[in-house]
Amino acid sequence: MKKLLYISVNTKPEEMSSSKTVARKLINSILEKHPSMALEEVDLYREHIPQLKYSYFESRSAIVNSEALAKLPQDEQNEVTQIIKLCDQFRAADIYIIASPMWSLSFPAPLKEYIDCVVQSGKTIAFDENKPYGLLNDKERTFIYVQSSGANIPWIIRPALNKGLNYVHDIIRFLGISKFEELLVDGTGTTELERQEAIEKAASRIETLVDQI
């Protein structure tokens, strides 16, 4: 059974969040076309996302083994167990959807902390002559980044301003996922009318994206 992993990073209720509203429309369309697909959801403001410590690792990006884990204090054992859980869940997915607002030219901090948890040696990356490479090219995977922003960002300056999108694209491609799509909810503005127009414009691309899955 294929798995769809939905990761949201916004404290707003779904009906108030433009990125989460569009992401839900996308998810519903995917599940309508693929009813047997399993959906898992991670809200990065509700799920505990550990901050990494040196004591959690035995080597570069490699989580401690079970013997070393047992020697850690119980609270640190719990943190390592959560990191492993998040990484294993990420690695098992076939389709990924992230819903995030654009904050300060990037994204909210919990998303970076989450990415740090799922980049693990032997699971999502490996090293060859001290050079890292991704392991998630082992099967067909699709990644869709849904991002909302208050302004309409001209495409010609988007690479310079949209640093969050650039980073997510680069790290996902580095992990080995070659199929990366963006679904931008630009121009949510300052009024509800502007927000709804931006949502409708972004949602008009959903059918095309779903057909590519």
Curated annotation (Swiss-Prot):
UniProt: FMN binding residues: S17, S18, S19
Alphabetized GO MF terms: electron transfer activity; FMN binding; oxidoreductase activity, acting on NAD(P)H as acceptor; oxidoreductase activity, acting on NAD(P)H, quinone or similar compound as acceptor
Enzyme category, top tier: oxidoreductase
EC nos: 1.6.5.-, 1.7.1.17
UniProt keyword list: Flavoprotein, FMN, NAD, Oxidoreductase
Pfam families listed in its UniProt record: Flavodoxin_2
Catalytic reactions on record: 2 a quinone + NADH + H(+) = 2 a 1,4-benzosemiquinone + NAD(+); N,N-dimethyl-1,4-phenylenediamine + anthranilate + 2 NAD(+) = 2-(4-dimethylaminophenyl)diazenylbenzoate + 2 NADH + 2 H(+)
Cofactor binding note from Swiss-Prot or TrEMBL: Binds 1 FMN per subunit.
Cofactor(s) in the UniProt record: FMN
Similarity comment: family membership: Belongs to the azoreductase type 1 family.
Assembly description: Homodimer.
Its biological purpose: Quinone reductase that provides resistance to thiol-specific stress caused by electrophilic quinones.
Protein name, UniProt field: FMN-dependent NADH:quinone oxidoreductase
Species, as recorded: Ruminiclostridium cellulolyticum (strain ATCC 35319 / DSM 5812 / JCM 6584 / H10) (Clostridium cellulolyticum)
